[in-house]
Amino acid sequence: MPETTQDTCASAKDSPFFIKNLLNSDSKPSKPKPILAPTKAGLDGSFSLSQVGEINFPRFELPTQRFALPAYLERASAWWYPYTLSASAHLHRTEAAQKARDSSPTTGTDRDSPELVLKSDPDAKDDEDDNKSGDEIVLEEGDTEDGKKEGGIDDWKKSDDGADKKPCRKKKTRTVFSRSQVFQLESTFDMKRYLSSSERAGLAASLHLTETQVKIWFQNRRNKWKRQLAAELEAANLSHAAAQRIVRVPILYHENSASESTNTAGNVPVSQPLLTFPHPVYYSHPIVTSVPLLRPV
């Protein structure tokens, strides 16, 4: 019986479920496996890891040799944390990744091509857009504003040029002739309406004018002469139309009837009309034509 109790106590002490053993096992935890073990070699080139509890978190520390790494380390170190870089570093990484993608073959894994991972992760895109520096936004707005200002200036210049071109019309020069020149030109025009080239040249030389001035004067004088002829012809037509409205009115006489002549004495002469006209009278007024001239009885 005592041997049995001793064996039971010894087995209880050696049991892993004993309180002391459980406390000892809790005080000495086993070393956890690192979560980021496959990518630790690539992450050491860009930033180090800090351990908080049992989870490893990256510390955002960029070494000075960060921008001098080759393209492979550039892609391997920043393919899953694109938002850890600043705007300038992100631009540098994008240019290096573009060059590496152009030089590498088209076939490859997702780890070798960071662009595929970035495209498939919308959260990474949002973080990347949020972490853009304010300098980039200001520069973009400034560029657009400058472009708008330049475009506005060009439009304003074009509108001014168009406004200047519209009223720009060549003014006609007006030649002032002296009295002697006008008299000589009028006398020549009365003799001849049209001049030959030699006559025009001689007249221009005698009047100290150019041939163009003499030619223009004769053209204007012929137009004036034609207008005068048209006005005279119109006046003649009006007078002819007025003459056509004149109506011929004959003079009417009332002869003595036979009964009156028989009743009167033979010695009494017959009364003659007071007014006698050897030829008919013309009246131009229409009212007078309707009233005949009667002899008093």
Swiss-Prot record:
GO terms for cellular component: nucleus. It comes from the Eukaryota. SUPFAM superfamilies: Homeodomain-like (SSF46689). Residues 109-123, 145-166 have a biased composition (Basic and acidic residues). Residues 170-229 bind DNA. GO terms for biological process: cell differentiation; inner ear morphogenesis; otolith development; posterior lateral line development; posterior lateral line neuromast primordium migration; regulation of transcription by RNA polymerase II; spinal cord development. Induction: Regulated by fgf3 and fgf8 in otic vesicle. Residues 24-43, 96-172 are annotated as: Disordered. Keywords: Developmental protein, Differentiation, DNA-binding, Homeobox, Neurogenesis, Nucleus, Transcription, Transcription regulation. CDD domains: homeodomain (cd00086). Pfam families: Homeodomain. Its main location: nucleus. GO terms for molecular function: DNA-binding transcription factor activity, RNA polymerase II-specific; RNA polymerase II transcription regulatory region sequence-specific DNA binding. It is found in: Nucleus. Belongs to the HMX homeobox family. This is Homeobox protein HMX3.
